[in-house]
């Protein structure tokens, strides 16, 4: 009888079995969240890759000089806001810049604006309303330079909550008023 009692005590309860399974294989909720994030990342990368075909239709490309690139399209006289045709970071950004150069599209370097557009906008959508003023300044500058005017590069002022670092974290309120 002593032996039988000892063996029974060694057996795991159903809850202990579940807990051990979660410890060794990970909880189903965490695994599902990881799978969902991987799927979203993959879909986003596919959208960025497909958007590269639209770069030749861009009005301007805003860059950070190599890490981020956002291709914008704006029709003068249109009542619509500028639209994001393509955007990417790293290799995709390099490809956007390369295609922009091939298509003779004006490239404007503005790290803060490029990151703001990247982290707050979506491919195929209009730019966020909070960035209208900054993008308008850039597009006006580009149109005038493309017409042959010799202008000084404008300072781009962004709303405080639209300033991001390269990881998408908002910058502290006191970090620079103009383009960094």
Would you name each region that the model predicts?
Residues 1-88, 93-97, 107, 111-119, ...:
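N-terminal cationic and glycine-rich segments that engage phosphates or anionic surfaces
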